Regions:
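Small-residue-rich segments of transmembrane alpha-helices in multi-pass membrane proteins
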Residues: 17-24, 73-74, 131-148, 194-199, ...
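Multi-pass membrane catalytic core of lipid/isoprenoid biosynthesis enzymes
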Residues: 42-43, 60-108, 190-226
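Membrane-embedded alpha-helical segments that form the functional core of polytopic membrane enzymes
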Residues: 17-58, 90-98, 102-116, 154-176
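C-terminal ends of transmembrane helices
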Residues: 56, 61, 113-126, 174, ...
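Intramembrane alpha-helical segments
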Residues: 2-7, 73-153
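Extended hydrophobic alpha-helices typical of membrane-associated regions
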Residues: 3, 14, 222-279
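Functional transmembrane core segments of multi-pass inner-membrane proteins
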Residues: 28-40, 133-182, 186, 199-211
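Structural signal for membrane-spanning alpha-helices in multi-pass inner-membrane proteins
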Residues: 21-28, 93-101, 115-119, 140-148, ...
């Protein structure tokens, strides 16, 4: 049960997502001991975990094919238990965001609503859901700055390179996931990006996003005076694995190869976090 709950909450993904709030605050020179900042971190974790739990509730049919070892398909966690967890996370997100002010509270409520909409409808909207997830992920840099300083646009603008870089990277990885999940999504009649456009066309889009990420790192990072180790680490540890993924995603690529690429990109994501911490 405990292991199943840990997997349901996707701690390896939801905790790093909450750390993006801290990272954004650091990039804006905010004091990391600020209580409001940690409320924003907790709210982001609850929102992200809520998204994963409701995703598993919505995807049970296809997960029996694509991810049969997940807690709901295996029966380790029941649908009823998962719904209770989702309600608790929803409540936690709102309770943590409420002390930060009306605007942060409404933004948290909007994020929860968008994640629910994604899991119920947008995931089948051939790219719309992927854009939403990438946007929400990239936006995770901002709440910490707002929690500490309010809407100080000069500080928020300093996050532009990091936000753009994360958006391109997450969108590329999200599109690759649609290739991984073709079998299950096709079986339940979903119209994901890979099913609508084909795996090779998806590869070309990922290639384009790789170029955009490369351009962001080369042009914007030095322009915004991010430290040079950040640029070097991003190129070697993030852009290069993404380029390798594009190279590997041939028509003959097996499911295991696609999953290896996804694992590589997950590692690249953490390298990117370290790189930005050095910025």
């Amino acid at each position: 049960m405990v292991v199943g709950l840990v997997r349901l909450l996707r701690l390896s993904n939801s905790l790093p997502a909450s750390l993006l709030v801290l990272l954004g605050a650091r990039l804006a020179d905010a004091p990391l001991h600020n209580q409001r900042l940690w409320l924003a971190v907790a709210a982001m974790w609850a929102i992200t975990a809520f998204g994963y739990v409701t995703n598993d509730l919505s995807d049970q049919a296809e997960d029996r094919i694509n991810k049969p070892d997940r807690p709901l398909p295996t029966g380790v966690i029941t649908s009823g238990q998962a719904r209770v967890v989702a309600i608790l996370l929803f409540t936690c997100a709102l309770l943590c965001s409420a002390p930060l002010g009306l605007a942060p509270f409404l933004i948290a409520l909007l994020a929860l609503g968008l994640l629910t909409l994604y899991n119920r409808q947008l995931k089948s909207a051939a790219g719309m859901g992927n854009l939403l997830i990438a946007g929400l992920a990239a936006g995770a840099f901002l709440p910490g700055v707002v929690a500490v300083y309010g809407w100080q646009w000069v500080r928020l603008l300093n996050l532009v390179p990091a936000v753009l870089g994360l958006f391109f990277f997450v969108l590329a990885r999200e599109l690759l996931k649609t290739v991984e999940d073709i079998a299950g999504d096709q079986a339940v009649g979903k119209r994901t990006f890979a099913l609508a456009w084909g795996s090779q066309e998806t590869r070309y889009i990922i290639g384009g996003l790789t170029v955009l990420l490369f351009g962001t790192v080369i042009a914007l990072f030095p322009w915004w005076r991010y430290a040079w180790p950040t640029t070097a680490l991003m190129l070697i540890g993030v852009v290069l694995p993404l380029a390798w993924t594009v190279y590997s995603l041939t028509p003959q690529a097996s499911l295991s190869q696609i999953r290896q690429c996804l694992a590589l990109l997950k590692g690249a994501y953490f390298v990117g976090l370290v790189a930005l911490w050095l910025a």
